[in-house]
């Protein structure tokens, strides 16, 4: 139970967290419209003759309001797939830690699935960043270019995972070798 000085007690803290102004002043009604009183007054003094025409047009606050555009990321399956990839990574990262502590060798199929699901998770995360910060409605060419670059980088990374799994011992073994102090035995893509 939260108490505000001089006001009634608030039983539910979620109202304070969600909207602290309404929690402190429950009877206060705040308007979210911008006030153009001084600007409209100047315009009204300058355009006295156009009073009949302005009633037919929409007011300035209605003209300025634009409903939010539909987002590609909202209500799509991409969020669900990203969540599935995120929760799949939890057990897949625990198994290599267990294998490294016990001295065992990790299965190559498990190593390939760990690295490819990690790549899928990163690709979904970067796709959502592109959708949020380079909107298709505002920057159509840059949005498409960013997505093509992301897909190209993902395909190149998938080829790198294939090379790592077939020519080396895999992603987990590479990380294990990178954490070792002696790097004489480190072999990455044809370099000694």
UniProtKB/Swiss-Prot annotation:
Subunit relationships: Component of the TIM22 complex, whose core is composed of TIM18, TIM22 and TIM54, associated with the peripheral proteins MRS5/TIM12 and the 70 kDa heterohexamer composed of TIM9 and TIM10 (or TIM8 and TIM13).
Chief place of localization: mitochondrion
Keyword flag Transcription regulation: no
Knockout consequences: Although cells lacking TIM18 live well and do not display any strong phenotype, they do not survive in the absence of mitochondrial DNA.
Naturally occurring in which organism (per UniProt): Saccharomyces cerevisiae (strain ATCC 204508 / S288c) (Baker's yeast)
PANTHER family reported in the protein's UniProt record: SUCCINATE DEHYDROGENASE (PTHR13337), SUCCINATE DEHYDROGENASE [UBIQUINONE] CYTOCHROME B SMALL SUBUNIT, MITOCHONDRIAL (PTHR13337:SF2)
Coiled coil: none
Note from the entry: Present with 4440 molecules/cell in log phase SD medium.
Purpose: Component of the TIM22 complex, a complex that mediates the import and insertion of multi-pass transmembrane proteins into the mitochondrial inner membrane. The TIM22 complex forms a twin-pore translocase that uses the membrane potential as external driving force. Its role in the complex is unclear but it may be involved in the assembly and stabilization of the TIM22 complex.
GO-annotated biological processes: apoptotic process; cellular response to oxidative stress; protein insertion into mitochondrial inner membrane; protein transmembrane transport; response to arsenic-containing substance; response to osmotic stress
Record GO cellular component, one term: mitochondrial inner membrane
Family designation: Belongs to the CybS family.
Descriptive protein name: Mitochondrial import inner membrane translocase subunit TIM18
């Amino acid at each position: 139970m939260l108490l505000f000085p001089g006001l009634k007690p608030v039983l539910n803290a979620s109202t304070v967290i969600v909207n602290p102004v309404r929690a402190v002043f429950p009877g206060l009604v705040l308007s979210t419209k911008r006030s153009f009183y001084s600007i409209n007054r100047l315009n009204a003094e300058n355009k006295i003759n156009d009073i009949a025409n302005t009633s037919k047009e929409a007011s300035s606050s209605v003209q300025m309001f634009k409903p939010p555009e539909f987002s590609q990321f909202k209500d799509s399956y991409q969020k669900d797939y990203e969540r599935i990839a995120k929760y799949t990574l939890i057990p897949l990262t625990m198994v290599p830690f267990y294998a490294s502590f016990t001295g065992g060798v990790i299965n190559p199929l498990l190593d390939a699935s760990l690295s490819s699901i990690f790549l899928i998770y990163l690709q979904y995360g970067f796709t959502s960043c592109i959708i949020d910060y380079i909107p298709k409605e505002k920057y159509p060419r840059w949005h498409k270019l960013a997505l093509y670059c992301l897909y190209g980088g993902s395909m190149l990374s998938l080829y790198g995972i294939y090379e790592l799994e077939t020519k080396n011992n895999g992603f987990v073994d590479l990380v294990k070798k990178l954490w070792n102090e002696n790097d004489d035995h480190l072999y990455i893509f044809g370099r000694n």
